[in-house]
Amino acid sequence: MNTPESHIHDIVGIGIGPFGLGLAALSDPLPDVDAVFLDQREEFRWHPGMMIEGATVQVPFLADLVTMADPTSRFSFLAFLKDSGRLYPFYIRESFYPLRAEFDEYCRWVAAQLDTLRWNRTVTSVTRNDDIYTVTAEVADQCGQRLRAESYRARHLILGVGTEPVLPQALQNLETEGTGPVIHTSKYLDHRDALLESGSITIVGSGQSAAEIYRDLIDDAEARDVRLDWVTRSPRFFPMEYTKLTLEMTSPEYTDHFRALPDDLREQLGREQRTLYKGISAELVDDIHDTLYRLSRGGRKLRTNLLAESELIAADHDASTGDYALRFRNTALDRCFDRRSGSVVSATGYKSQVPAFLSPLGDEIRLDAKGRLDVSRHYTVNDAGTIHVLNGEEHTHGVTAPDLGFGPWRASVVLSHVTGREPYPIEKTIAFQTFGVPDDGAIDDGALDDWALDDGALDTTPLNTQDDVESHFDFADSASQPDSQPADDREMTHA
């Protein structure tokens, strides 16, 4: 009998978030795929710190783990509803958007049916001998105590380690022992009571997570006379853009277009496109305003402040009062102001990291000039095309990287490379619009030199003034962008 150390799998997946779990579900019925998936957690949990009562996911139920690749899969969200006796109630509810807790329950339902998942495995190193990778993992018991080391061998690696919470520089080394909490949104529910007990709360950042926490706290904060501030460096509290032609940017065609752009232009577009998936749902924006209107009836003065164009630049702990002294800079006026707060919630997003366990592979892993994974169009990071990435490619592939609905498409691409065939049909075109230059109207390099400025010919006059530039392009500096933070589905999807 083969042991884990001697058996050679087709795939070893590292990380079991929604994207890794989706790939595991899609690989399960394939007879020519031998896969195993490892995760350091003891079970599947999807952002437990943000399971706010009544919160919904921001994408329709079709954007589940598998449906966009295989609508007939037994692992679909509709199959989960049928199995749990909730299909007809969901139908009568007449909403495309599942409850967030329900989506987490669905993912755990899928995980329970897969025998390829290995929990309590912390990967410590990956090495390669010829064409075979060896993944070494520490195995822990339910209490986190180390039991043993295991090795798994495979021809392909799937990196689904996802993203890590980010705190602003001003908060990273703040002394918090014995005082009110300074937390990332990912830990919100664990500290909700302590936040309200601190006497005053400041939420830093914009986007869906910040908005949900503000809405969850405002009634209790007013009832308990707790000041609640919401501060963002964005010029306003951006709604998420969810129009249909904009949604076509989550398409293979736009991904091809984005991937082919120069690095500096991709960086610029990445900042400009944050409202596509890091903004606030329009319904929640309206609910917050309606709530403030309700709470202020009778001329009541609310103990809350919503401050845009305000960037956190410094923070310190005042031992004499136990409060935090926060300094902000108004980016429009270039003026600073101070606020005191008993606790702080940072809604400033997540970022991808290059896993340390890849270090033994050295130069086999492609990195860009900023030290990030240099992910190919087909989601690989080595020249052999055998190390694949899930949700670590936003800087190379754009808005499709964190999108739940695009996950099955990416998994289909990965599985086609692993199997050498197309087990799930891969759509090449889905958008009505064209991104880039249309094929039937392309002009050869240098052909513009032959054009004359007469009779409606192309105007190639240089753009010399700022007004000229702004009339042609919608460029904005980083100060006018939404704070980098997760919308709960389009980014909060640790693979």
Can you annotate each of these PLM segments?
Residues 68-101:
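A conserved beta-strand/loop capping segment in the N-terminal third of enzymes
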Residues 1-42, 46-48, 90-208, 212-441, ...:
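Flavin (primarily FAD) cofactor-binding/catalytic cores of flavoenzymes
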